[in-house]
UniProtKB/Swiss-Prot annotation:
Enzymatic reactions: RNA(n+1) + phosphate = RNA(n) + a ribonucleoside 5'-diphosphate
One Gene Ontology CC term in the entry: cytosol
Name of this chain's protein: Polyribonucleotide nucleotidyltransferase
Organism: Streptococcus pyogenes serotype M49 (strain NZ131)
Top enzyme class: transferase
CDD domains per UniProt: KH-I_PNPase, RNase_PH_PNPase_1, RNase_PH_PNPase_2
Amino acid sequence: MSKQTFTTTFAGKPLVVEVGQVAKQANGATVVRYGDSTVLTAAVMSKKMATGDFFPLQVNYEEKMYAAGKFPGGFMKREGRPSTDATLTARLIDRPIRPMFAEGFRNEVQVINTVLSYDENASAPMAAMFGSSLALSISDIPFNGPIAGVQVGYIDGEFIINPDKEQMEASLLELTVAGSKEAINMVESGAKELSEDIMLEALLKGHQAIQELIAFQEQIVAVVGKEKAEVELLQVDADLQADIVAKYNAQLQKAVQVEEKKAREAATEAVKEMVKAEYEERYAEDENLATIMRDVAEILEQMEHAEVRRLITEDKIRPDGRKIDEIRPLDAVVDFLPKVHGSGLFTRGQTQALSVLTLAPMGETQIIDGLAPEYKKRFLHHYNFPQYSVGETGRYGAAGRREIGHGALGERALEQVLPSLEEFPYAIRLVAEVLESNGSSSQASICAGTLALMAGGVPIKAPVAGIAMGLISDGINYTVLTDIQGLEDHFGDMDFKVAGTREGITALQMDIKIAGITPQILEEALAQAKKARFEILDVIEATIAEPRPELAPTAPKIDTIKIDVDKIKVVIGKGGETIDKIIAETGVKIDIDDEGNVSIYSSDQAAIDRTKEIIAGLVREAKVGEVYHAKVVRIEKFGAFVNLFDKTDALVHISEIAWTRTTNVSDVLEVGEDVDVKVIKIDEKGRVDASMKALIPRPPKPEKKEEKHD
């Protein structure tokens, strides 16, 4: 296929798609140019079904530093593992694409997005999402799209689609919404305490804008789209399924209704093992035993799936016996740990998170050097999910995509209420350790983070709580669930996380397993989430009503002084010599910004005070008319040099020592002698002249003797 180009304008910027010129061996490939951002997307599918019990979809978002005219950092000067932002963008694209494949589809699919040029005012992630959907849609991969996504901002009561950098900085909302022509299927958002009504309107505005992008994709697919390949879907043997359902469905139904998680897991596992043992013995000599046992496992999973959903939709019974809108038992604790700067332990049913606060000087901020201009990140929220939290063994190592994503969600939820840098000049790190998990651990980490911040004396604007909402839908009837647990998440259709204060929402995240959800479901879920959020805030505020007025004794204290910008080099010294000497002497940490704000950090107030004295002395300037208690440091024939303070010396000319004539300076002064002097002049080069006699009353002139005349 020769190169074909398709052009439109979206949100005030040119959107150009090129097909047929590059990556022609992939199943589908596109080059998307949005503004001056260029993204190459290639989609590839394996020829055979994978052996696992899940859909092996991999979406990558690769940031090439040349796209922004930069050299990669580090010794190797080559791109390494994806940045946090790249990982989050890959997740952002994966989530709306994944539900658009058929149930039982098991061929491996890879969608690789490579950023070739970068324009900070034209969203490369949104271009990559568009390109991912289009590459799949024009390929022979059986993808039931297209989908598209947009960013939505909110400034002065107006919604803005795909805002530029300046607009996003002024926006009260940073929302990404994706979906198909029919419905929304992915949401990711941070917001400055906006109401449910505004958030819902933003979602609908975003979905409305998506229609234009989907129509553009459909236009392109009509011209260059390939016929979809016939692939084998994972299907179980119908006779085998009927046999197992008839024999064991009643036992599995009973096991599913055991309310306690571990007991329920044991009961369902016992039924499954019994069934597997029977059929493995029955078909032991069959050459297709492996396929049969795979089908047995899949049938049992489908039976459990169907029963959990039936109980909720028909009988309104949840696995643990709760009502549809009921939250699990809550508990909140502060000061769980000694010595740390703040800690909070939050428990919701069998989900428990410990959050630990660390405060540090601003010099500890994380430097983010990606495609965008380098910036410093003051607030970090890290989320850890050890396997013991679900009673299992597993891999331990670097944080995976899920942990990075959950950490970022908590970060968005909490950073909206943090004090400004001027109010609280600290770098802030929260680490959430999930100690138990039965669903909604990311929201528990937000609640625990609120507790840790307030316990640590961080003056947040308001406490934040989070809740996860679920959905069970049969296409006609639906049930929205409050505070979903693991089984409801696993077998449900939606995981809709909502975090916020009493004033409004600070973060949203939605993932679904069906093609999309309606505005009515969104509205109902937001309303139930608000009610639940207020219940959780009641528990948090009963434990700690407001941030403590003081930091923990172990936290670094801070004092800030202002110096003239031209004195910064004096404090730092040649090659950092002066500031290093101060730090070595006092044991403090010092940060100096470009405006002359000097921040001094230490857990020892005396060390801070001593540092302030030293710096004040370094930047102090002599002033004409001021009197100083000085020390003679050098004697010359023409006068004496005296030290006024620190490194500031002055010349006391021989004529300024006394009102009477001084013949030899050394007859009057000696090195090391303390004298009081008054500054009488500072020249344009900063040289200081001082006087001793100016502090001594001038003696009266001697009277003239009368002449005698004979």
